[in-house]
Amino acid sequence: MIPKKIHYCWFGENEKPLLVIECIKSWQKYCPDYEIMEWNSKNYDVHKNKYMEQAYQAKRWGFVSDYARLDIIYQYGGIYLDTDVELIRSLDDLLETDGYIGFEKNVDE
């Protein structure tokens, strides 16, 4: 079973825009019993490998998150969400599987 943990990355210490704040509120609303964990340079070692270190120094936060998200899920389990993902219902139905991957599709296509 996948643990009730939602992980997200916020490297760079910039203030979160309103969209990100609203998306995180949707996670709290639809998954109130989940632990929501923000990963950043204070609680994640961005010097784990040369790729991440170079990306961090270049302020390429998305590249830092690309590696960190996989490492975090591998180590702690749970669900990783990008900060622009808005939930419209609980994620509980996904927890009984061994794993899954999601992707976005433009609804206009």
What are these model-predicted stretches?
Residues E13-V20, A58-D66, E109:
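Aromatic-acidic/polar surface patches that form glycan- and anion
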Residues G62-D108:
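GT-A fold catalytic core of metal-dependent nucleotide-sugar glycosyltransferases
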Residues M1-N49:
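N-terminal anchoring/stem segment of glycosyltransferases
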Residues E35, V46-F63, L94:
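An acidic/histidine-cluster motif and surrounding catalytic segment
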